[in-house]
Amino acid sequence: MIVIPKLPLGNFASILRVIDKCGGYAELITSPILLRKADKIILAGVGAFDYGMTSINSMWREELENAVLVRRIPILGICLGMQLMCKSSEEGHLPGLGWIDAKVRRFSWSSNLNLKLPHMGWNTVKIVKSNPLLEIGNDEQRFYFVHSYHVVCNNPRDVLATAHYGYDFTAAINHENIFGVQFHPEKSHRFGIQLVSNFLRL
């Protein structure tokens, strides 16, 4: 069963629709105990880092870590969900889940670039490491982004793909059974549908 914890910071309807298009079925759960039945987990979210971690710490963390770290259930973090998997964020004060050896940093450039935050819209994603999650037919794919912070991995082997906005940043990560994407596959049409299909087959 694919489960999606119903944190108070996600666009779950769009994700459920994409999973349905892929021929899968996902259950939006409000009880952490239902994570014990999961064979795939999607951690989705938008918003502030500390708010997300407060939501997880309040009721989800123990069962999430049992599923992901002990039972090794594949998990896909989307946008804030990916950032919460890291050790910390410049956006907040609370520690993250720490599953990925990485920190989350705010975009910062010289003023002459005249770039705006959030980084919003379509961007090309370049695959830097082969992985079944991103087997979509070519090395450069386009996905939809909405974010002001990005993940900086301490271990380059955890980086699956990058994108460019002023400079190259991490667009997708993987460490063992843990996957994350900074973009929104549920808003990324055929590329997003293929990525979700790939995750369901892992």
Regions from the language model: what does each represent?
Residues S88-Y165:
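Pocket-forming structural segment of enzyme catalytic cores
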Residues C79, H147, H184:
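Histidine-centered divalent metal-coordination motifs
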Residues I41-A44, V68-S89, L97:
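Catalytic nucleophile loop
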Residues A48-Y51, Q83-H93, F183-P185:
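A short secondary-structure junction motif
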Residues V3-K6, Y144, F179-F183:
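Active-site-proximal beta-strand elements of phosphoester/diester hydrolases
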Residues H150-L202:
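C-terminal and late-domain segments of enzyme folds
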Residues M1-P74, K103-S108, F191-L202:
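N-terminal beta1-alpha1 cap of cysteine-dependent amidohydrolase-like domains
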Residues P74-G77, G96-L97, L117, R142-F143, ...:
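A residue-level structural signature of the nucleotidyltransferase/glycosyltransferase Rossmann-like core
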